[in-house]
């Protein structure tokens, strides 16, 4: 099985949860979409390190970390996230 096929099989079912988490953290649709896109790219890049235990938890951890990194990029985003 191709790496991409396996990745899609494991992680695409969690796309809605990934978006919901990113949206909850940053509060804006466009930012959440960008975060999920970046998180999926990071997940694909690090896929060889995935041990297969819990794909949803692994992916959502990447989404959360990507969102927090995103917030740190600009004070305006940080201020919006702090209000939650």
Q: Where does each model-flagged region fall?
A:
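A short, charge-rich alpha-helical start-of-domain segment used by transcription regulators
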Residues: 1-20, 30-36, 44
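Structural recognition of an alpha-helix C-terminal capping motif at a helix-to-coil junction
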Residues: 34-41, 45, 53-65
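Hydrophobic recognition helices of helix-based DNA-binding modules
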Residues: 18, 43, 47, 67-71
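Arg/Lys-rich amphipathic alpha helix in sigma70-family domain 2
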Residues: 61-82
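Residue-level signal for short amphipathic helical patches enriched in basic/charged
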Residues: 13, 47-50, 62, 74
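Residue-level signature of the cytosolic catalytic core of signaling kinases
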Residues: 3, 51-53
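Pre-signature/interface helix of ABC/ABC-like ATPase nucleotide-binding domains
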Residues: 8-9, 48, 81
